[in-house]
Structures are given as C-alpha cells and as structure tokens.
Amino acid sequence: CACLVGSEMCIRDRDVADHEYVWMVDYVYDHFDAFKLIACCSTGTRYEHYLDALIEIEVNASHLLMEKMQREGLNVLPLDDDMVHILASALFNGLFETVRHDTPKEKAVAYVDTLRTFYSAGWFKILGIQ
C-alpha cells in the first residue's frame, strides 16, 4: 500500500491491502486443483489468459491508487503503463509460483507476505514517497 504515512486513510488502505493478500492466498489454496490446472495446463483453453486478466485488474487498480495519491496531495513520480504491468505481472507470477511448485499453504502464506513487504517498500521507493 502506498499512501499518506501516518494518516487514518493510510492505515485503512494498508489494512485492506494486507487483507487482500491473505484473501488471495486463501482463495487460491481453497481451490488449489483448479489453480494448478490454470497455472500449468490451461494453454489452448478458455483459461489460458486467466493470469493475464488478473494482472490487468491489478494494473488498473494500481493506476487508480496512484491517481488517488495525487489527489490526496502526494507528489508521486510517474510510471508508464509498461512498468506498472511488469510489476503487477511479477507479483501475480510470484503467487502462481507457489501453485506451480506445490508449495504447502503455510509456506505460501509466508512467501506472499514477503512479496507484500517487498512490493510495498518497492512502490514507495519508485514512486518517490518517503
């Protein structure tokens, strides 16, 4: 989550963002067999571009968040669409790696939490937020 540090909105947004990561892992692991098929065997099926659709949703959400930050008065550095796509793709591919490699859920939760920490810090840095 990138937002106004110390503000009530930041705390709320960060809690929502943290919850979303937990929810994603729970959902994927509650439907593990389906996600395993999507991750490993979907070429040529209607699910072939499922991951791409998730990435596009994340890209759109990222743009909305950056616009919100600017409206809130943060001077965020601009990122082009390709960079936002690369970051979103790396995040979702990290989650799907836990499925591709049959990572136990407990480890997947820890790995995705590390990804969340990494991406939060990275977003602050590349957007120029102190």
Labelled PLM ranges:
Residues D15, H19-D33, T45-R71, D82-S89:
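Amphipathic alpha-helical packing segments from all-alpha helical-bundle domains
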Residues N75:
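Short, charged amphipathic alpha-helical segments flanked by flexible coils
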